[in-house]
Amino acid sequence: MWFFIYSAVLFVIVWLGTGIAVSFKTNQFQLTGFKFSRKLYYLFLSIFLVAALLEAISFYDVNAFLDFIIFMFAGILGETVFSFWWRTFFAKPIWSYKADTFGGEISSMLNFIPWGVSGKFAVMIWSTYRQFTGSGVDLSIFLLLWLLFIVFFLVQLVLELVMKLFSKKTLASSTHRELSIYIYFTLPITVALILLTFALGLNFFFLTVAFGVVYFVSEFLFGYFIFLLSGKKLWQYNFMPVNGGLSSIYAIIPFCFAGFYFTTIWLIVNSF
């Protein structure tokens, strides 16, 4: 929680400071409409690195900063793997990045710090969930979720290979309906989450929804702020876009799973 408090305070300071600095050049105070540059982008994003460092210093806990660094790289890795998985079912990527891209616009070098923040969001949501529900959900449950996901993913993969071997088609390519393919694509995630919801109850369902909603909203707010600040969109969703292409309905289920992805990493790292 302190990470986000520090981030909010630093954000206000940097935003106002930028407006004042620009006013000396333009003789006009402004908080939006700046020209996009990597210096401006990293100026604002650096507040999260500083916030993570302040959190580590405040609680004499170096892991608070190391966790952030791990989340940065884990986020890029997860985003890249997910994008390749998506492309096995769809002709176009689910999103296209517009600056400092790699891998055919499936990710961006500008994404490291935002993914670090995403990891912090996941830990905050999970900690709040544990505090208010007293739930016994721990690392073993998260590992069980991953086991279920891997099993159903492998089943899906085998079905695809069998279909392609005998008919030169796959289950995904046998229909041209985008929504049908999407439902089939997300089955390993949704089935694993549904099974654990039946086993653990509604509280687990609420945790899942919280991950999806918080990530969906925060992604839009971040993208919209950058657009408001500089007039530049850093990404565009290609499927079921909403909010001017900064969000997608199709991203909600992957976002739900992303919360468990980051929390699992955090639990493993902090178990040593």
Q: Where in this protein do the model-derived segments appear?
A:
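Aromatic-rich, lipid-facing transmembrane alpha helices and their immediate juxtamembrane interface loops
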Residues: 1-272
